[in-house]
């Protein structure tokens, strides 16, 4: 039998034909991993078609051997769509969808049918979320907006009770806990990557991080993506696919429900399907109490970024996590008179000062003189303090040790031992519980030179809300936000526990500026970028903007137009990176 294969060669897009001799042809199927010889080298390749008609007059070489069971046929087909949608290599997606270890090929029977749960999900558990369980699993995409304090496990259990369910989470720890909880409920479930072989056999629910979007799950009955707004679901290396996008397409092709769960759904999710949320009282009760400290009127006698409300919390004896995210930040300037943050008049992002003394926007590159747009003064001061300096200030103020926690590590052996911890946003991802979370300089998030800055800021507040007790608890926790922009929509949404209010305004703003998801965007960079964008067909609705920092932006009204244009353009030799749906612009 003649098969068509995709060689595992970086940058190679050509598919080749090989013959599978007897008796192996009885075992071969789409997705299987085989060894081939190509140009004197032995390479691995994935079978993407079986029983093809080879071109006339061409000698077909045999495959060397059947190497391993690979992605299920429907997943192998999905990678063809993924290569088009994310303008990348199909072989890279096939590698992502493959087992981390070799699985010996053998005759495959029908997938076992999942038995009914020995301990079904309680309707009261789903009802406690303020949702109607009967409406959750309608065909298509459902965006489930639940507050930070709500446990999403009942949704997962309800889905798994219907049959094998694919569950995608941002973090491995959450995935492991969910897989164990499904098992304790009498539902068959495996975690990735260790459970890939069992998942390939079928009949069980599959739980994993973003790579689970390409994992086997047969027969698939539902797809659930938890915290769909989390950037950990996006693959940074090319092709830069997003697990949420893959999950939506996979569910569509399989004809099963897709649930996107989040306390603050992304605009991409909101545009993909209907929104289900609890009543306002229930949703608000699941958000924390958010105290906003207006830093425009900071006490000059206190050290920088230490306000009177923060000092009161620190001296209360409570467990406090202080967040100051300096990694990769732009320089911030504030008026020495009124204290207003220096921001771009065009897009609202923070501005820095170039060598000539002018103020330059880090997002849109607009240039303006050194003048406060609020009071007209020409004297600006730097607003910058690092985590280490803040730790020293806090230790002096409260008279006890303070731990420092960043993505690179902690200042001590155990970052959870001290009562007060200060760190970057890594702290709220590595610590499970606190009485209070304080964002010392939230302006960094609100005015960052990124088009998603507001959305990302709200996501941080939601994450902090999971560390502290909600406002409905007998002893509610608090989230303290120090900012010079207290009326920012993201802050107001967290204070009121109403993320829908933020989403409405954010959608309008991005549509006016031509940013995703209102427009489809790709970034093109590296040495071959100039040649590639020159070959794009821009006679229609395709826009090519740039270069800025040696990157070009390609923009179109929709993904069908954008991805079609990217696929049709010739690929020049040399390094080329195409990032579709970039998280940062």
Segments from the language model and where they lie:
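Conserved RecA-like helicase motor-core motifs
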Residues: 185-195, 345-346, 354, 399-408, ...
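Cys/His-rich short segments
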Residues: 306, 312-395
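Flexible beta-alpha connector loops of hexameric P-loop NTPases
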Residues: 230-241, 296-299, 379-383, 445-455
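Conserved segment of the helicase C-terminal RecA-like domain
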Residues: 246-268, 456-493
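Amphipathic alpha-helical transducer elements in NTP-driven molecular machines
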Residues: 13, 25-28, 44, 72-76, ...
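Accessory helical-bundle/CTD segments and flexible terminal tails appended to RecA-like ATPase motors
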Residues: 9, 102, 106-113, 122-124, ...
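Accessory, non-ATPase domains that flank or precede helicase/AAA+ motor cores in DNA-metabolism machines
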Residues: 1-288, 315, 436-439, 447, ...
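Conserved two-lobed SF2 helicase motor
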Residues: 196-217, 406, 413-430
């Amino acid at each position: 039998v003649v098969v068509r294969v995709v060689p595992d060669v970086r940058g190679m897009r050509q598919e080749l034909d090989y013959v599978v001799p007897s008796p192996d042809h009885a075992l071969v199927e789409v997705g299987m991993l085989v060894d081939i010889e190509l140009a004197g080298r032995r390479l691995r390749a994935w079978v993407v078609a079986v029983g093809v008609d080879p071109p006339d007059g061409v000698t077909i070489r045999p495959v060397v051997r059947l190497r391993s069971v690979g992605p299920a046929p429907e997943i192998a087909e999905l990678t063809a769509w993924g290569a088009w949608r994310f303008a990348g290599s199909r072989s890279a997606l096939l590698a992502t969808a493959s087992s981390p270890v070799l699985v010996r090929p053998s005759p495959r029977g029908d997938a076992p049918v999942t038995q009914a749960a020995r301990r079904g999900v309680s309707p009261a558990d789903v009802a406690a979320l303020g949702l109607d369980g009967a409406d959750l699993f309608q065909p298509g995409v459902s965006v489930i907006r639940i507050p930070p304090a709500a446990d999403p496990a009942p949704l997962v259990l309800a889905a798994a009770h219907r049959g094998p369910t694919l569950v995608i989470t941002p973090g491995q720890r959450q995935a492991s806990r969910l897989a164990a909880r499904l098992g304790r409920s009498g539902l068959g479930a495996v975690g990735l990557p260790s459970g890939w072989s069992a998942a390939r056999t079928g009949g069980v629910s599959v739980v994993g991080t973003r790579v689970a979007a390409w994992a086997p799950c047969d027969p698939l009955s539902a797809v659930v993506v938890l915290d769909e707004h989390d950037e950990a679901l996006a693959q940074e290396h090319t092709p830069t696919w997003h697990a949420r996008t893959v999950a939506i397409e996979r569910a569509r092709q399989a004809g099963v429900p897709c649930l996107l769960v989040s306390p603050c759904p992304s605009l991409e999710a909101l545009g993909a399907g209907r929104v289900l949320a609890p009543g306002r009282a229930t949703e608000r009760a699941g958000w924390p109490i958010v105290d906003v400290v207006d830093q425009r009127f900071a006490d000059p006698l206190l050290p920088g970024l230490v306000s009177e409300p923060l000092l009161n919390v620190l001296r209360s004896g409570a467990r406090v996590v202080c967040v100051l995210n300096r990694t990769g930040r732009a320089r911030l300037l504030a008026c020495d008179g009124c204290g207003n943050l220096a921001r771009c008049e065009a897009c609202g992002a923070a501005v820095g000062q170039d060598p000539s003394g002018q103020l330059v926007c880090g997002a849109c590159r607009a240039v303006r003189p050194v003048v406060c747009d609020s009071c007209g003064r020409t004297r600006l001061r730097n607003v910058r303090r690092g985590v280490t300096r803040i730790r020293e200030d806090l230790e002096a103020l409260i008279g006890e040790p303070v731990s420092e926690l960043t993505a690179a590590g902690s200042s001590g052996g155990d970052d959870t031992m001290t009562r007060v911890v200060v760190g970057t946003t890594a702290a709220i991802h590595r610590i499970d519980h606190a009485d209070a979370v304080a964002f010392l300089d939230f302006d960094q998030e609100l005015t960052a030179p990124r088009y998603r800055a507001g959305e990302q800021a709200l996501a941080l507040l939601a994450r902090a809300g999971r560390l502290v007790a909600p406002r409905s608890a007998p002893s509610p926790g608090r989230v303290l936000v120090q900012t010079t922009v207290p009326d920012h929509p993201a802050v107001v949404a967290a204070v009121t526990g109403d993320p829908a209010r933020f989403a409405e305004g954010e959608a309008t703003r991005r549509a006016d500026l031509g940013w995703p998801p209102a427009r489809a965007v790709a970034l093109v960079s590296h040495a071959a970028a100039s040649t590639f964008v020159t070959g794009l067909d821009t006679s229609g609705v395709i826009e090519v903007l740039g270069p800025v920092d040696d990157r070009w932006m390609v923009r179109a009204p929709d993904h069908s137009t954008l991805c079609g244009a990217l696929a049709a353009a010739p690929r020049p030799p040399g390094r080329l990176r195409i990032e579709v749906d970039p998280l940062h612009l």
